[in-house]
Amino acid sequence: MSAAFLRVGLDAPADLLPELTELYAGCLELRLVQPDAAAVAFEVGETVLEFRPAGGAPFYHFALLVPGDRFEAALAWADDRVELLPDPETDEVVFDFTSWDAKAAYFHDPAGSIVELIAHRGVGEGGASGAFEAAELLGLSEVGLVCDPPAAAEALRHELGLELWDGTVEGEARLAFVGEKARTLILCRAGRPWLPTGRPAEAHPVEVMLAGGPDGVVLLDGGGRVSRRATGDGPTVRASPSPRHDVRGG
C-alpha cells in the first residue's frame, strides 16, 4: 500500500491554537480547512494537518515535502517567514542528506514541534520557476512516532505491509524509517534527540491516515499494539504514549 499521508492529527495546547493558525495559515499561507473551536486544520498538498486541543505541552517532528527541484526557492520562502534552526556544529541551516539525495531545513512552530522542509531529488519535480508558493508543497513527507520501534515496525509490516526502507529498529540512538522514500514514518525511542536541536523525543498522541490499503482503520499505540475498526476512509496509524546515531538525523 501507499504510505502517502492523507491526514495527520496532532495534539496542541488549546491556548496555542490561535498562534498555530497565525503561523500555518498566516505566515506560511496554508489553506485553513477546519477553523473551529474543536481543532484547526490546514491543507498541505495531499495532506490535511490537524491540531487538536489537549493538555500538557505535546510536541512532534514532522516534515513538509518540497518538489525536488524547488528546494532553494522553498528555503528562501521559509527564511522570509520563520527562523530557521542551524546545525549546532556548522551553524548552517541547510542539511544535506547525501545518502537520500535530499536537502532539508528546520524550524519550530509555536507548540515547539520540530518542522522540517525536505526535498528529495527526483520527487515531485515539475520544472517550476520563480518565487515559491505554499501551494507547491506536496504533502507531509515524514511523521515521527515515538514508540517501541521493533514492535511498531512489526505491526506496520504485518497490518499494512509497510517495510523498513532505511535505518534500523536496533539500538537506543537509532531511527527506523518505514514506508517509502518521501513518505516515511520515523520510529524513534523516547529520549532519543531530534535533529537539529537535540531535544529528547517524547511520546504524545498522533493519528495518521494513510492512502490506499484495505478498508478499515489500523490503530497503533506506542507499545506496538494494533487494533482495527471499520471505516471507508483508509487505514489510520495512531500512536499514543506507551506505559512502561542514525542513518539520518531525523
Region locations from a protein language model:
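Glyoxalase I/VOC metalloenzyme domain signal
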Residues: 1-6, 10-34, 43-90, 101, ...
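Ser/Thr- and Asn-enriched, surface-exposed coil loops between beta-strands
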Residues: 36-38
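Short loop/turn motifs at secondary-structure junctions and domain boundaries
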Residues: 95-100
